[in-house]
């Protein structure tokens, strides 16, 4: 039986969402770790002259052993097929992100621009995750990420699996409009010009409760070595790994690149940490405090057991679809949504997760009463004006 107790769920949501998964890369499972160095460890671009003061942030858990799949995946081979139309090759690149993965996250502050700023230590974490194709329609693909993690205790015993919904990414071809983050917990829907839309795919990223996080437009490029999509400059709200340790800036401004390879995929971020005025504009007197690089590596697994994640996904899928549709309707009707604060920081998504847990435990379909619960939860977040 997998672990869905409230305490376990709350711990994993706090630790893993929205940006990372509460652990160090020392647990890179199924591969032998090198001996501990005698001198303080060094991290690329991480201010090595400061010695041990910039050791990585993150957690300290270790994961159960896994086996990496070193063979080219079927999705990669399908992506390489000759004679595909450009849009179809793009679609296959997006679908190639589905599967089972060991995920490692690295975020590194490489430059500081404020005289009083001190560089943060690198942030490193890990997780095991299954990415599901939730929808595959003409010009639209939706991918849902579910975490299923087994931890090693101090005696080397493997825990029962922890399961939680993580994030969702939607991909739409030549969209009519985009919902953009504007700072201070506000998102606005903006129509797109033909020049922005033509041949482009919009990626929209959603948080654990289906609330918006960020969206951007970009175009896929393909080669025999990899397929890659690069976003335009995008505003993003601060993730937990940042707002939990600092308050000297308000928005991440940067690019997001997805690169598909034979054995998995990589997500790269190049972010400026930007200061906003009370009017949600970049503060020209001190616009940026630092720059960071981010890297998430999704390494495909072989013979991985994600039965608990499958169970959760199948039983709660219709409920989370209702939540997603309610968010979409709010933006269609209002155009702008300003929340009362970060939903993960305030714990405003708790009623939604509690209801999803009930649905999973009882094996019942989402009911009519859920529409009221969802609207009430979104209302408490500040969705409705």
Q: Where are the regions a protein language model picked out?
A:
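Amphipathic/hydrophobic helical signal segments and adjacent flexible N-terminal regions
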Residues: 30-96, 109-114, 119-121, 139-142, ...
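Extended serine/threonine-enriched, polar tracts that run as long, contiguous segments within proteins
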Residues: 230-277, 288
């Amino acid at each position: 039986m997998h672990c869905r107790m409230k305490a376990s769920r709350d711990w994993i949501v706090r630790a893993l969402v929205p940006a990372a998964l509460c652990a160090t890369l020392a647990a890179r499972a199924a591969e032998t770790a090198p001996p501990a160095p005698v001198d303080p460890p060094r991290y690329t671009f991480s201010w090595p002259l400061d010695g041990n003061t910039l050791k990585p942030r993150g957690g300290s858990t270790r994961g159960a052993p896994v086996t990496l799949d070193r063979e080219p995946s079927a999705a990669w081979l399908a992506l390489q097929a000759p004679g595909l139309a450009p849009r179809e090759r793009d679609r296959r690149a997006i679908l190639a992100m589905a599967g089972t993965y060991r995920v490692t996250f690295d975020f590194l502050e490489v430059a500081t621009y404020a005289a009083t700023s001190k560089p943060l230590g690198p942030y490193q974490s890990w997780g095991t995750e299954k990415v599901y194709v939730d929808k595959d329609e003409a010009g639209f693909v939706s991918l849902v990420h579910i975490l299923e993690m087994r931890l090693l205790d101090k005696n080397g015993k493997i825990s029962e699996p922890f399961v939680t919904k993580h994030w969702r990414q939607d991909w739409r071809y030549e969209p009519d409009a985009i919902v953009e983050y504007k700072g201070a917990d506000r998102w606005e829907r903006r129509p797109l010009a033909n020049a922005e839309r033509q041949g482009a795919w919009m990626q929209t990223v959603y948080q654990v409760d289906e609330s918006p996080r960020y969206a951007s437009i970009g175009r896929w490029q393909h080669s025999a070595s990899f397929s890659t999509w690069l976003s335009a400059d995008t505003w993003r709200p601060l993730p937990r790994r940042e707002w939990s340790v600092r308050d000297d800036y308000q928005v991440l401004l940067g690019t997001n690149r997805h690169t598909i390879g034979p054995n998995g995929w990589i997500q790269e971020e190049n972010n400026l940490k930007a200061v906003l005025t009370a009017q949600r504009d970049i503060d020209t007197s001190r616009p940026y405090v630092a720059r960071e690089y981010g890297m998430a590596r999704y390494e495909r697994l072989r013979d991985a057991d994600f039965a608990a994640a499958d169970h959760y996904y199948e039983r709660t899928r219709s409920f989370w679809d209702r939540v997603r549709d309610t968010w979409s309707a709010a933006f269609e009707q209002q155009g702008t949504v300003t929340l009362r604060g970060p939903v993960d920081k305030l714990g405003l998504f708790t009623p939604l997760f509690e209801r999803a847990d009930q649905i999973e435990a009882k094996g019942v379909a989402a009911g009519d009463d859920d529409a009221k619960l969802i609207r009430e939860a979104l209302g408490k977040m500040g969705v409705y004006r």
